[in-house]
Design a protein with these regions (language model features):
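Long, internal low-complexity/basic segments
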Residues: 381, 387-393, 411, 447, ...
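Acidic/histidine-rich catalytic neighborhood
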Residues: 233, 237-243, 249-349, 480-488
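Active-site neighborhoods of enzymes that stabilize oxyanions during catalysis
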Residues: 97, 288-444, 448-454
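Short, structured active-site-proximal loop/turn typified by the sulfatase FGly-forming signature C/S-X-P-X-R
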Residues: 18-60, 105
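Metal-dependent active-site segment of extracytoplasmic phospho-/sulfohydrolases and closely related
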Residues: 28, 216, 225-265, 269-270, ...
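His/Asp/Glu-rich, glycine-adjacent segments
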Residues: 61-215, 285-318, 332-372
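Short catalytic/ligand-binding loop motif for oxyanion handling, primarily in non-cytosolic enzymes
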Residues: 14-16, 49-50, 64-65, 112-119, ...
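Active-site-proximal N-terminal segment of extracellular/periplasmic enzymes that hydrolyze or transfer
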Residues: 1-37, 469, 506, 513
């Protein structure tokens, strides 16, 4: 059977790539697009790593597996819990490949930590495979266990780069460390594919989107994409191999930062409590300043290992309180709504939820800056999500205008600002490209859903499509290709849950949960 090699390009968009394709910067990608079927994709809302990598691999929307962003907000229980791979209640396309006797390898795809038992191999990656806010994980991130030692010995493999990129003024060794990491992802994926004779291989370049966030189309991102282009050429030359390029979402240059919880407070939907941030912030004591000093002194690892996490969490972030500390800053008895970043908004059912929702949605539709409305859509949760976990969905979901970054920090004081740390923000418009023996070269297709990828890739491997997958099989096969529906299979064990605090800290350092 022809092998399929899927390259997951976190945050890739044709908006970023088209100029480089046209000016000759990415010659292999340009040539590949001429001989393939390709499309712009539409991600599930919100267009973020969590949940969209699982949307790709499961063919389902978040209402089917119960994760809507990096955190789960439960105002009844007064908790905010950070998600990891064990929280996604779903089987994935490689489970169906295994069920049909085909082997698969998944390298560095977010949402896969703790590593699941997939036949043949899983190498979990960023951002969820972590040991602490400023420390990479050294072991326990592979299936089978022990493979992590082999990768370290043979490839000097790392899950996260060191030093970690944390700002757009860091263009030296932090960027070089990411480029080295991307190179090793490809080396490991190709080696495992060949040595283990894998029939399906998926490798994700998560830190590619970290470069997008901090630099957009500047030189660090361009260097990374030139590296990707070189590997695209190598993979395209492999015999009997389908090559698929895809992304979990797209990206666009940031124009506006919108502090949604600050806006909710201003509009009367949220009431506040005084916190330690209110004392330390006026003194200039924030996490960004202290990290900069620690990096300069070369003591980041020492401080991360010696200062207890609970003490680290007391140091405020410049943008305001995040994660569970958001609820410490909120008087829930007088609060009607609390937001996560990048789209989800949760309502307090101690109030009249439908009345609050109607009023809040109307107000959100009117929010604007100098460039117009901030949101292209404001939806009820049930309009966006379906499935057994839809009752846990946020009551409201906003779709951000390209370039708008919705920040969930509480207590920073500002509502709408110019971009701060991030030069680019996520958008729902990602990429898909399929080339190789099993695919017809149909050129540009109409916009497709990210949910279409899993059923299409199963059909490429002569597998039937489970009835609980929402996507459609793309018209990129010859007329002789046939398939049927099949019953879904049940989910096996997914491993022990990782400490959600550690996951949150890594996301926070990268700017995902600022």
């Amino acid at each position: 059977m022809t092998r399929t090699f899927v390259v997951g390009l976190d945050g890739a968009s044709w908006r970023l790539l088209d100029p480089w394709i046209e000016d000759g910067t990415l010659p292999n990608l340009a040539a590949l697009r001429e001989e393939s079927s390709w499309a712009q994709t539409r991600s599930c809302l919100p267009p973020v790593t969590f949940p969209n990598w699982k949307c790709y691999s499961s063919g389902k929307d978040p209402g089917d597996f119960g994760v809507y962003w990096f955190e789960r907000v439960d105002l009844d229980a007064e908790t905010i819990e950070v998600m990891n791979g064990g929280d996604f209640d779903t089987v994935e396309l490689w489970d169906y490949l295994n069920d049909e006797g085909q082997s698969a390898g998944v390298i560095n795809m977010p949402t896969m930590y703790p590593p699941r038992e997939v036949e043949d191999v899983v190498v979990a990656g960023g951002p969820d495979a972590v040991e602490g806010e400023y420390r990479s994980i050294d072991s326990g991130y592979t299936h089978p266990s022990g493979l992590d030692d082999e990768l370290a010995d043979r490839f000097d493999y790392r899950v996260h780069p060191e030093p970690l990129l944390s700002g757009n003024d860091e263009r030296g060794e932090e960027v070089d460390a990411i480029l080295d990491l991307l190179e090793k992802r490809f080396e490991v994926a190709v080696t495992l594919a060949e040595e283990r004779d894998l029939e399906y291989v998926h490798v994700t370049l998560f830190y590619l989107n970290v470069l997008h966030h901090f630099f957009w189309d500047e030189e660090p991102s361009k260097r990374a994409w030139q590296l990707v282009d070189e590997w695209v050429g190598k993979l395209d030359d492999m015999d009997d191999t389908n090559l698929v390029l895809m992304s979990d979402h797209g990206s666009a240059p940031t124009t506006t930062e919108f502090y949604v919880n600050e806006w909710l407070a201003e509009q009367g939907y949220q009431a506040r409590e005084r916190t330690v941030e209110d004392v330390l912030r006026p003194l200039g004591l924030d996490r960004e300043n202290l990290l900069r000093v620690a990096k300069t002194a070369g003591v980041v690892d020492l401080l991360a290992e010696t200062i207890p996490e609970r003490i680290q969490q007391l140091i405020p972030q410049r943008e305001g309180a995040k994660r569970a500390r958001k609820l410490e800053a909120v008087d829930l008895d007088r609060t009607q709504a609390v937001a996560s970043g990048q789209g989800p908004i949760y309502l307090n059912d101690d109030f009249d939820v439908e009345s609050v929702r109607e009023s809040l949605m109307a107000d959100l539709r009117q929010v604007e800056d100098d460039e117009g409305k901030l949101f292209t859509g404001v939806y009820k949760g049930e309009e966006v999500y379906d499935g057994p976990y839809a009752d846990e969905a946020p009551e409201i979901v906003v779709d951000m205008r390209p370039g708008v970054h919705v920040n969930d920090g509480i207590g920073g004081g500002e509502i709408t600002t110019a971009p701060d740390r991030w030069a680019a923000e996520n958008t729902p418009q990602g990429i898909f490209l399929a080339s190789g023996p099993d695919f017809e070269a149909r050129g540009q297709l109409k916009q497709m859903s990210i949910l279409d990828m899993a059923p299409t890739l199963l059909v490429a491997h002569d597998c039937d499509v489970p009835t609980d997958m929402h996507g459609e099989v793309l018209p990129i096969f010859d007329d002789d290709r046939t398939w049927d529906s099949r019953e879904p299979i049940s989910l096996g064990g997914t491993g022990a849950a990782e400490d959600s605090e550690e996951v949150a800290e890594r996301l926070q350092q990268l700017g995902y949960m600022e």
